[in-house]
Amino acid sequence: MTARSTIDVSRLSTYAFGHRSLMWWATIGMIAIEGTVFAIAIVAYFYLRGLSDAWPPSGAPPDLLFGTINTVILLASGIPNHFAARAAESENLRSVRLWMVTCLVLGLAFQVVRALEFTTLNTHWTANAYGSIVFALLALHTTHLITDFIDTAVLTVLMFTGPLNGRRFVDVNENADYWWFVVAAWLPIYFTIYLVPRFFP
């Protein structure tokens, strides 16, 4: 019987960033699934639009103000999100704390404006198919926003209270990847809800 060769892995890191992390692959898989859900919802919007003589049926598209403000807030949130991810990769606790708190402030601002946005859609979810699909798109995105906001809040608290280890920094990095998905998912929704009815009636 031959002896098995072994490799001493005791000095290898117990965590990793990017594609070397199992959590990164899980996040990418979740983004792929949820991105498909967003795509299906947008396809449903255009399917229903194709069945309607007038779109929106009331003739009044949603007001641009709050949707546009939210677009600016989301794009701006990419800055602290990027720096939080870079600080996490270098395990710079002070910078991670700063940028995570900044992400929370912008995430909260987005939610406040989103609440106002729902009031200026010029339709209600029970009014007709148009109202239902517009509310569904916004509710779908809002759900993702709220869940990632909660995740960001929990991670921020943990960065102040501990326990702190390398894996916690990986969590911050993966959270940043997911936030980019939330930002990217908003852009086609904004185009669909706010610009299509105005420029492609």
Language model features: what each stretch is:
Residues 1-201:
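...captures the hydrophobic TM-helix bundle architecture rather than a specific catalytic motif
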